[in-house]
Amino acid sequence: MAKKSMIAKQKRTPKFKVQEYTRCERCGRPHSVIRKFKLCRICFRELAYKGQIPGVKKASW
């Protein structure tokens, strides 16, 4: 889990546009965030296995 101070800092509008970055909406993780779902890879995997993300299923070939 991310610190509350870092989550609050990220929500503020930055002075420059390039300072914006993605953060997982569920746990606050700043790295490996899937933009389409706004989730980090770990949270995405957990929710996908539970079937809570519509249209996502485990690949098999």
Swiss-Prot record:
Its cofactor is Zn(2+). One of its GO terms (cellular component) is small ribosomal subunit. Binds 1 zinc ion per subunit. Gene3D superfamilies: 30s Ribosomal Protein S14, Chain N (4.10.830.10). The keyword Nucleotide-binding does not apply. Keywords: Metal-binding, Ribonucleoprotein, Ribosomal protein, RNA-binding, rRNA-binding, Zinc. GO terms for biological process: translation. Zn(2+) binds at C24, C27, C40, C43. InterPro entries: Ribosomal_uS14, Ribosomal_uS14_bact, Ribosomal_uS14_CS, Ribosomal_uS14_sf. SUPFAM superfamilies: Glucocorticoid receptor-like (DNA-binding domain). GO terms for molecular function: rRNA binding; structural constituent of ribosome; zinc ion binding. The keyword Cell inner membrane does not apply. Belongs to the universal ribosomal protein uS14 family. Zinc-binding uS14 subfamily. NCBIfam families: PRK08061.1. Part of the 30S ribosomal subunit. Contacts proteins S3 and S10. Binds 16S rRNA, required for the assembly of 30S particles and may also be responsible for determining the conformation of the 16S rRNA at the A site. PANTHER family: 30S RIBOSOMAL PROTEIN S14, SMALL RIBOSOMAL SUBUNIT PROTEIN US14B. This is Small ribosomal subunit protein uS14B. The lineage of its organism: Bacteria, Bacillati, Bacillota, Bacilli, Bacillales.
